[in-house]
Amino acid sequence: LYPQNYSLIGSSNLKDLLHALTVALLTFKSFLSDHVGSEFLNLLTIKQYQLLSENLHKTKKLYVYGLPGTGKTIVALKFMEKIRAMLQCTKEQVLYVCENQPLRDFVQQKNICQAVTRVAFLRGIFDDVKHIIIDEAQNFQDGEGDWYTKAWTLTSSPHLPEPGFFWIFLDYLQTSHCYPTGLPGAEWHDPVESLTQVVRNATSIYSYLKEKMEEIVEYPTLNIPRQRLKMLLCRATCAHAVQGCIDIVTHLGRKGVARYVAERCHTYLKKGYSEKDIAILCYRDEEVKAYRELLASEMRKLEFNILLGRMEGGLGKYAVLESIRRFSGLERTIVFGIIPQSFWFHKEILRNILVCVASRANLNLHLLHD
C-alpha cells in the first residue's frame, strides 16, 4: 500500500528524517503568508519552544515578559492550540482576552478559541471557560472593573476538576498610557518567563528599538520593573540579518506628512509591493480622520489611488490607516508612524509610543513628526 521508496528509509537515514520532521513540527504559518499566494513557515526560536513545551507541564499560572517583536502573540496562539490538543478542550473552554478589537478579530479568525476584548470580558458571562490567555496586558485599564480577579476566579473555580491555565503576556516597554492596568504589582509576578529574541523586525529597526528601549529603562517616566527589564535588554538579540530601512523625518507639518506618505506609497506600489503591505499609523482617532482627507488629496495630485481602510474584521486587502493603539499586536511590511508634536502625557510616554510604532514594521519604517 505504501510507495516503493518508503522502503529506502533505514537506520542510516532515519535520524535525518526525524530531524526534518522535528523542524516541520516546530513551525508556524507566517501572518503574512498569503502575500505571494503561498505559505511560509517560520521556525519557533529555541526559547519560544522551551516556553511552550516545558511550562505547559510545569505551571498553570505564568507571566510572560516579551520584548517588542519577540512573538508573544504567536506563542499565545501556539499555546492555545497545544492545550486544546493535550486536554481535548473545545474552543469555548479557552478564552483569549486583549485590549483592542483588531487584535481580537485577528485571533478570532484562527478559530482556535473564544476571543474578546477586556471590556467585553468584564461585561460577559463565561461559565464554560476553563483556560484564559491575556495578551498585551500592559495596555489594559482597570476603569471598567477588576478583569484580573475575574480571570483568576474563573480559572481557579472550585467547580473545575483541576485549576485551568492562566497565562499573561505583557511588554512594559510598549505601555501606551499612564493609567492603572489592573495587574498586580510586578513584585507579585511569579513565576515569570521571558522572550528576548526579536523575530519580527529587520536589523535596522531592531537597532532603533534597542536604543529607545534602553532609554525607557535608563530614564523611567512610568512605573516599570526597571531591574527586570534591564536584564531582558542585556539578553536581547535579533534572530536574522535582514537589513531593512528606517527613515526619520521631522517638522513636516500635516500637509508635508501627507505628501511624503503619498509619494512613498506610490513608489512602493511601483516596486511591486501591494496595498496590504502598508500601514499608516496615527496617534489618535481624530488624526486618522484628518489624514484620510489629506492623503486622498495628495494621491489625486499624483494621479493614483489606494484603498485606505481601518482594521475592521481582521487583516484586510487594503492599506491600513489606523491609530497606534488599535494596531497594537499586529504588523505590516511597511509602516508609516505619524507622531504629533504634543499629546496628553507626551513627556511620560513618547519613547514608549515610538517603540509601539517601530515594532509594528517588519522591513521598512518611516517615522514622521508633523
Tell me what each language-model feature is:
Residues L1-V23:
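Accessory nucleic-acid engagement/destabilization modules that flank
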Residues L14-L21, F28, L209, L295:
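Generic structural signal of hydrophobic/aromatic residues within well-ordered alpha-helices
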Residues H35-Q114, R118-D370:
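Conserved helicase motor core of SF1/SF2 NTP-dependent helicases
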